[in-house]
Amino acid sequence: MASASYHISNLLEKMTSSDKDFRFMATNDLMTELQKDSIKLDDDSERKVVKMILKLLEDKNGEVQNLAVKCLGPLVSKVKEYQVETIVDTLCTNMLSDKEQLRDISSIGLKTVIGELPPASSGSALAANVCKKITGRLTSAIAKQEDVSVQLEALDIMADMLSRQGGLLVNFHPSILTCLLPQLTSPRLAVRKRTIIALGHLVMSCGNIVFVDLIEHLLSELSKNDSMSTTRTYIQCIAAISRQAGHRIGEYLEKIIPLVVKFCNVDDDELREYCIQAFESFVRRCPKEVYPHVSTIINICLKYLTYDPNYNYDDEDEDENAMDADGGDDDDQGSDDEYSDDDDMSWKVRRAAAKCLDAVVSTRHEMLPEFYKTVSPALISRFKEREENVKADVFHAYLSLLKQTRPVQSWLCDPDAMEQGETPLTMLQSQVPNIVKALHKQMKEKSVKTRQCCFNMLTELVNVLPGALTQHIPVLVPGIIFSLNDKSSSSNLKIDALSCLYVILCNHSPQVFHPHVQALVPPVVACVGDPFYKITSEALLVTQQLVKVIRPLDQPSSFDATPYIKDLFTCTIKRLKAADIDQEVKERAISCMGQIICNLGDNLGPDLSNTLQIFLERLKNEITRLTTVKALTLIAGSPLKIDLRPVLGEGVPILASFLRKNQRALKLGTLSALDILIKNYSDSLTAAMIDAVLDELPPLISESDMHVSQMAISFLTTLAKVYPSSLSKISGSILNELIGLVRSPLLQGGALSAMLDFFQALVVTGTNNLGYMDLLRMLTGPVYSQSTALTHKQSYYSIAKCVAALTRACPKEGPAVVGQFIQDVKNSRSTDSIRLLALLSLGEVGHHIDLSGQLELKSVILEAFSSPSEEVKSAASYALGSISVGNLPEYLPFVLQEITSQPKRQYLLLHSLKEIISSASVVGLKPYVENIWALLLKHCECAEEGTRNVVAECLGKLTLIDPETLLPRLKGYLISGSSYARSSVVTAVKFTISDHPQPIDPLLKNCIGDFLKTLEDPDLNVRRVALVTFNSAAHNKPSLIRDLLDSVLPHLYNETKVRKELIREVEMGPFKHTVDDGLDIRKAAFECMYTLLDSCLDRLDIFEFLNHVEDGLKDHYDIKMLTFLMLVRLSTLCPSAVLQRLDRLVEPLRATCTTKVKANSVKQEFEKQDELKRSAMRAVAALLTIPEAEKSPLMSEFQSQISSNPELAAIFESIQKDSSSTNLESMDTS
């Protein structure tokens, strides 16, 4: 420390030198010292350093002054508080100095100090004291109005301080407001402007009283309307306040908007511009409160969008031949200058109107149909705008409209969406000709910016409406070529033109482009050869698509591609051979050449084998190998049967080696490539090549990656079909892995189907030691030997399905094996595991093969219904249902008879019936529907809920067989006197709804409202199942319920409330325990709300929705967890609405995070509380992603509470890490 002090005193001495270079060097060295974390200054050194730095601020040399100011930053954090106060005092005094240079340098110094203070959320006393000290001096400097330059600096610093530390100055807010308000009438516009900025920062942290005073002052001054100049200022101020604190100004809009509307009619362009800008900020920041005024705002914007008093567009408006009239463009360009007028401010009004319409379109999704009637035609008619900046904003507004129209969820554009009448998409479709007509002239404009806007517009249009431009390609192609050939155009314009062409090529049928190929190929080929890599890369994408256009392989085409092949091949091979090009260009050149060989390979002659050799080289390169594998897969699948023999000998072993690389995408790509090679080139592959691949397969067949396993099994299936002689190699480790995977509980879905296909293909190859009985023993052996216990029930199902697959492939083996399984079930010495497997296998075999010849089968299965093992009983129930599907006339009447005569076995027999209804064909079941229906209705009033649920599922699935007859019958039971019957039919409806189109959908749409009326049922349980059914509809087929939301939501929200009358106390021994019978229904209601966020957001009043989310944040553990998830979704989906409610949301989150569990609680309680805290923190992290959320005083206070609590800080940090790593994973293109 002594040496540091000595070094610093040495520097201080040099700073007094008369030589400016000495002073500069010494100050620079001091700066370096102060930036070191290790530096510690004693009191004396601190005092001397501060004194010297302040002295150097008045140095004659400007460079020394600048360095001294920079030293203030690190110095503030290294010296004691009273020294910081000395610095601030001196700087404030110097700010009022007569010397201009000293004033300037001192104000920079103050900004530096303020910038270095710890944020308000840290709760630092230093920050608070310094800010208070500065505030008093600044307010007096601002209020004096003596020297404008001092005022401007003071206002600047005040704004800076309020934005960083506003929360610490709450006591000063009234005096700050008092000093700022008079400045709004300053004769200097610069002073007014900075005052508005300062007020904008003030309203983010000030208390309500100050905020009300400010708004009342502005409203009163606006009502007086003393002078046009101050009125403009007040409107600007209101807009600024709305931008910074929209959630606070909302309640005053009823008073503000009529005033602003009135001022729009005053003949003052500047005032109009500010009024429309104010509307824009209201629309973006006060979505709920502005809603009643949106139509008024749209009308004003539409009026002023065309406001151009100094220019006459008439000659262009009705040009019927505009599509062909390219010649007249230059004359129009020349006329601009005659009308151009330096005093003409009308363009600013038009720009404000376009931006405000953009805001309306972006925030009011529910008004889309209305926008297409009014806003869309108006914007299209303004694409001809003469002022470039305005035109760009008009285009941007239309882009926003298109983006809002793009279907976010697939059901929006599904044919089964069943929304009648004009939809936004059909309205857009009808306006496409007008859009193209308006864009056509703009695409030949000199302005690069305009042409870029046109390309962005066309790209978005085609993304929203694929195929929309089919009729208009002849008009658009010349415009695209114009930009590609334009020598003066920028790289970005060419990239946009190419990217637009690519999207158009991808989304229209090839025939549309055939007349234009001759014109398109030369400019695209030229772009492939462009020296700028980004243009080349984009052009290669277009070339690849052009290849598919000139010779589509998936449809007949009479187009002659021959004249273009040489040019396309030559430009691509040049890029493929080049070694020193950009990575993306390398990859796209490989993909493009792959497409050329796939579609045109039969025309390449000797070039083909040379090109394939280059592919072989690229396969050996780590950077290009994955792209090359994909290209080879494409070529190998080509119907042209490309000759790959020259590269297979060397290529297949390389591909085999990729299977052991630690790169998942490469493994998957390679398995696809090998699969297609085996299918199409088996006669060119040698046994050695295939053995090399088989050696690599065992590690890939594992439950740790089911997708890779599935691909590997599919490859083996292909091998069994086309190259059966190679299978003798698999009996060792590959088969062990396969059998191991069959026993895995994770084997389901696609991987299980692949496994079944494989066993069926394998068993018919006649390979030694891999016959039917061999494979059967391998699959079932462990169950019989009891050597390895199969812990998971799913494993038995998988083995049984494999047994059935083998038996279907070898039907002659069936009777003996079925007989054996029947004996296994009968045998009293069989373990439960053996019985379980035997029953499931009988079920799976019987599903596909008629087992009615096995006379004792029925009695054996019914006997198993009496087993003490629940799993055996369940398997017997499944087996009976599954066997019945194999021969309905034999088994279904038997099952129905048993249900009637065996009340004790009813539950199991109903499960058998459910299996029959779920799996049998509609035609097969039709004759039995009436009998089954009558039987089910007898049991739908059963008091046992489990039985009722099975009955409901059967009723629902049966209804799908004959919806026209059965759905009205179901509806009839809604008036049943039994609440059990009502809950059964409402649950049944849930099983008629699926996520794909079905014949029942239109019928269901007409009557689902009747079923949902049970949300008003007096019985709690009926209301709960109605919510579950509603949730299923909202999730799987939202179009069923979208139009009913206005009537359903009040009842849904009603069920989110805690009901005191449903809470009761139960005595458990010496303890009293509270039971809430309403919890389940509240949970169901909140689950519906969560689903609606994804499927019907545009139909929700989000503020009403948030009211109930707020209640949920204070509810039971399960509901809190759901509402935390909702907050995370809401932060992304409607951030501005959440921001308005932020202060009300923070409190319950804070309460959850700071709740302590009683020390004597059980471990579960601690775990639950911990999970609650983590979920609440996730919600906080999501809220903080909303721009300006951290500016809320309550939120910043909560943040400082989190950072000062080690436990909460640790949780918060880990959640932020998790979310950033999730984002990185989602970016992983593999």
UniProtKB/Swiss-Prot annotation:
GO cellular component: cullin-RING ubiquitin ligase complex; cytoplasm; cytosol; Golgi apparatus; nucleoplasm; nucleus; ubiquitin ligase complex
Any single biological process term in GO: positive regulation of DNA-templated transcription
Stretch list, region Disordered: 315-344
N6-acetyllysine: residues bearing it: K55, K971
Tissue expression from the record: Detected in heart, brain, spleen, liver, skeletal muscle, kidney and testis.
Any one Gene Ontology molecular-function term assigned to this protein's record: TBP-class protein binding
Compartment(s) of residence: Cytoplasm; Nucleus
Keywords: Acetylation, Cytoplasm, Nucleus, Phosphoprotein, Repeat, Transcription, Transcription regulation, Ubl conjugation pathway
Residue numbers of N-acetylalanine PTMs: A2
HEAT repeats: 2-39, 44-81, 83-119, 131-165, 171-208, 210-247, 248-282, 289-366, 370-407, 424-467, 471-510, 515-552, 563-602, 606-643, 646-683, 688-725, 729-768, 770-808, 809-845, 852-889, 890-927, 928-960, 961-998, 1002-1039, 1043-1097, 1099-1133, 1140-1189
Presence of keyword Lyase: no
Residues modified as Phosphoserine: S335, S558
Assembly notes: Interacts with TBP. Part of a complex that contains CUL1 and RBX1. Interacts with unneddylated cullins: interacts with CUL1, CUL2, CUL3, CUL4A, CUL4B and CUL5. Does not bind neddylated CUL1. Interaction with cullins is abolished in presence of COMMD1, which antagonizes with CAND1 for interacting with cullins. Interacts with ERCC6. Interacts with DCUN1D1, DCUN1D2, DCUN1D3, DCUN1D4 and DCUN1D5; these interactions are bridged by cullins and strongly inhibits the neddylation of cullins.
Similarity remark: Belongs to the CAND family.
Stated role: Key assembly factor of SCF (SKP1-CUL1-F-box protein) E3 ubiquitin ligase complexes that promotes the exchange of the substrate-recognition F-box subunit in SCF complexes, thereby playing a key role in the cellular repertoire of SCF complexes. Acts as a F-box protein exchange factor. The exchange activity of CAND1 is coupled with cycles of neddylation conjugation: in the deneddylated state, cullin-binding CAND1 binds CUL1-RBX1, increasing dissociation of the SCF complex and promoting exchange of the F-box protein.
Protein name per the record: Cullin-associated NEDD8-dissociated protein 1
Organism phylogeny: Eukaryota, Metazoa, Chordata, Craniata, Vertebrata
